[in-house]
Curated annotation (Swiss-Prot):
PANTHER family: DNA REPAIR PROTEIN RECO (PTHR33991:SF1). The keyword DNA damage applies. Keywords: DNA damage, DNA recombination, DNA repair. This is DNA repair protein RecO. HAMAP family: RecO. Involved in DNA repair and RecF pathway recombination. Belongs to the RecO family. InterPro entries: ARFGAP/RecO (IPR037278), DNA_rep/recomb_RecO_N (IPR022572), NA-bd_OB-fold (IPR012340), RecO (IPR003717), RecO_C (IPR042242). SUPFAM superfamilies: ArfGap/RecO-like zinc finger (SSF57863), Nucleic acid-binding proteins (SSF50249). Disulfide bonds: none annotated. GO terms for biological process: DNA recombination; double-strand break repair.
Amino acid sequence: MAQRALVLHRWDYQETSLILDLFTEDKGRVRVVAKGAKRPKSPWRGLAQPFMPLLAEFQGRSDLKTLTLLEPQQTTQKLLLQGDKLYSGFYLNELIQRLVPTEAEAPELFESYLSALQNMTNSERVEPALRQFEWQLLQHLGAAFDWHYDADTGNVLSDSKWCYFIPDHGFVTQARDNQQRAYSVADIQKLAAWDVDDENRLRLLKYIMRDALAVYLGDKPLRSRELFRGTKRQ
């Protein structure tokens, strides 16, 4: 049965085929061989691209499935990502590839991913969509933290003026060392309500999400982030 899917990444395979890393609605991440997809007359040739809502079918018992159907999904808004939005889309794709295992069902995360791409298409501001997806990814990983209580004491953060973020733990009101970034509790309370209209507060959210995800990403740098920085230096 066909299911909604988007291409996260693609590789050349042999002379005429491609390997696609798909993010699908029902099966999560799946790697498939698109046989003959590079042939000039293949109906899949122009479809096997990131950020194109698709319907896909595949079969096989191994980790590498065989693609049997790939067609555009007519009922979903077309995704038009250019410039910084395109690199932001690559960033989301890389997060999924790095942190979501293959063949692990993730229907809610699929919807979050599609929603993030649509929001980036429709808005001039990409940061809110990125930060929201990062938070939903942390929830999917079981790494969500509380925005209202001190992770050490259980006391409400609002009893204090300043707090600090400890990755894989949460917010605390006592710093671990003098190198930690201090956050205004008032800002954290606004972020907890997803009040991201203020650019300075949105920047704080970026720091928090980056620190939270770094625990799971490890030391290997994100290729999409390096590519984006490279364009800014040109």
